[in-house]
A protein has these predicted regions:
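Extended alpha-helical targeting/anchoring segments
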Residues: 1-483
Length: 483
């Protein structure tokens, strides 16, 4: 059955630029992974976005897409938009250019459709803040360079509804010639159904590590970075900062098998796999950067870390130590305040609230203290404003944020790129959900990169901070090795 009907869409078509048309099929013989393989057989540009609760219960939806109709990327103020034609130009405000594109795709929401029905999928790099804070002078000294923003526009979506055991196929159509476009959408939905049910699956190219992972900082060097950070804290420049350590190895093949391992060993609230012509990224992020659903903003600060115990008894003992650790609580509270401040920039007066505070969440190798901050977005702001307000997260930079970013840029050896940035989607209807780019790997030009960091405050012990970076990188590195 095709929904909505043409008659239903005709009633509302004058209010919108595009409308979604969908078809449901059974999902009993397909999985997100084998559908992804079918998509990879016909397109080098694909994505898979999934979610798992921390108790290992899978979220309701998995979203897949291929063959974007537009690609949007910007690096060092040089912006490119690739569609039927390609344009490249210089800009100081890529957000404005992205907004112009999204404004051409105003779409309604239907209760029977999933949370994402089409829009932009991709990432905003950590260094994207250079456009909202021009005084930050990021020099691009990295041997392999990542775009400041890289987004793909998908007007077709394949959504697995794991609760109803169905696949929802979605095609977005323009409203200017509705009946013609509706009939075309029916044909495209049937073609999508055939692709999902019978499409030839691309073989999974084995990912191969061709060298051991090498850290940018030795343990001693990283401990020195921690001490230098603490010197800035003692001078009163900052209260906290989050230095990081990049590991890299020579690599060939695909990260898809590593993603399959992550799905089993480290299910997390944000599971993602994205592939482009010259880049692949995958990860299992525990942390929302910012989420906007029907006017409600949310962010979920995570700060305060302990390793997982060997058994339930040790887990509970570690949890008790963590929740009573003054240093970890002070670090967490600072970042909750920073999250409130970020949302406060674009929220209605007195609407920002901490709705969950000091909750322990367990993941495969570590446990964290988590909180939830919510606010109601002001009508003059949108999803892109929310990303600009929150990026990069205080949990990946520090407090005060701008001074912490300046210090980290001085102390770290390479730009962060996607690490500490935002990964996810911006929906045609105005909603958005992006996670922080952590617990992830990026493969590009024969290298694979894994980066991790930890919050440093005045009482931090340098050796412990180095070990925290090891613990946080462990699940991703193990997934690559097992794949």
């Amino acid at each position: 059955m095709i929904k909505p009907s043409l008659i239903e869409l005709e009633r509302i078509s004058d209010k919108y630029d595009i409308v979604p048309v969908c078809k449901e099929i059974f999902s009993d013989i397909r999985t997100p992974i084998n559908v992804l393989r079918a998509l990879k057989h016909i397109s080098s540009t694909t994505y898979l976005l999934e979610s798992a609760e921390t108790n290992e219960k899978w979220g309701r939806y998995s979203f897949l897409g291929f063959n974007p109709s537009l690609e949007i990327f910007c690096k060092n103020h040089q912006m490119t938009i690739k569609g039927a034609m390609t344009s490249t130009f210089t800009t100081d405000n890529p957000t404005k250019e992205i907004r112009k594109i999204l404004q051409q795709y105003k779409s309604p929401r239907f209760d029977f459709l999933p949370t994402f029905t089409g829009g932009l999928v991709g990432y905003f790099a950590y260094e994207y803040i250079r456009y909202s804070e021009p005084k930050l002078d990021f020099k691009d000294v990295e041997d392999i360079s990542f775009n400041d923003v890289d987004l793909m526009l998908f007007d077709k979506v394949i959504a697995f509804d794991h609760y109803k055991k169905k696949i929802i196929l979605i095609v977005n159509i323009k409203t200017n010639d509705l009946e013609k476009n509706y009939n075309k959408a029916i044909r495209e939905l049937n073609e999508l159904a055939d692709l999902v049910a019978k499409g030839q699956q691309a073989p999974i190219t084995e990912g191969k590590l061709l060298s051991e992972f090498k850290s940018e900082f030795t343990p001693e060097e990283y401990e020195d970075v921690v001490r230098k950070t603490q010197a800035y804290i003692k001078e009163g420049d900052i209260f906290q900062a989050v230095p990081s350590n990049r590991k890299q190895a020579d690599f060939s093949g695909s990260l898809l098998n590593a993603y399959r391992v992550l799905r089993t060993t480290n299910p997390s609230p944000y599971m993602f796999y994205l592939s482009g012509k010259d880049i692949e990224l995958t990860g299992a992020s525990p942390e929302t950067l910012v989420k906007l659903q029907n006017g409600l903003l949310e962010t979920f600060p995570i700060a305060g870390t302990m390793p997982r115990g060997k058994n339930e008894l040790e887990d509970k003992a570690f949890e008790d130590i963590l929740i009573h650790d003054d240093k970890e609580l002070a670090e967490h509270n600072m970042l909750v305040d920073l999250g409130r401040n970020d949302l406060g920039k674009i929220s209605e007066f007195n609407s920002v609230k901490v709705t969950s505070f000091h909750k322990i969440e367990r993941f495969s190798h570590v446990m964290h203290i988590t909180s939830t901050v919510q606010g109601k977005i002001r009508p003059e702001f949108d999803a892109l404003d929310a990303i600009n307000a929150a990026l990069p997260a205080g949990t990946l930079s520090g407090a005060p944020k701008i001074r912490a970013i300046e210090i980290l840029h001085e102390l770290e050896k390479s730009p962060r790129g996607i690490y500490g940035g935002a990964i996810g989607y911006l929906d045609f209807s105005g909603n958005m959900d992006v996670c922080i780019g952590i617990r992830m790997a990026v493969a590009k030009q024969g290298k694979v990169f894994v980066r991790s960091g930890g919050g440093v405050v005045k009482d931090s012990i340098p050796q412990n901070e180095y070990q925290e970076t090891v613990n946080k990188a462990q699940s991703m590195i193990e997934a690559i090795k097992k794949a």
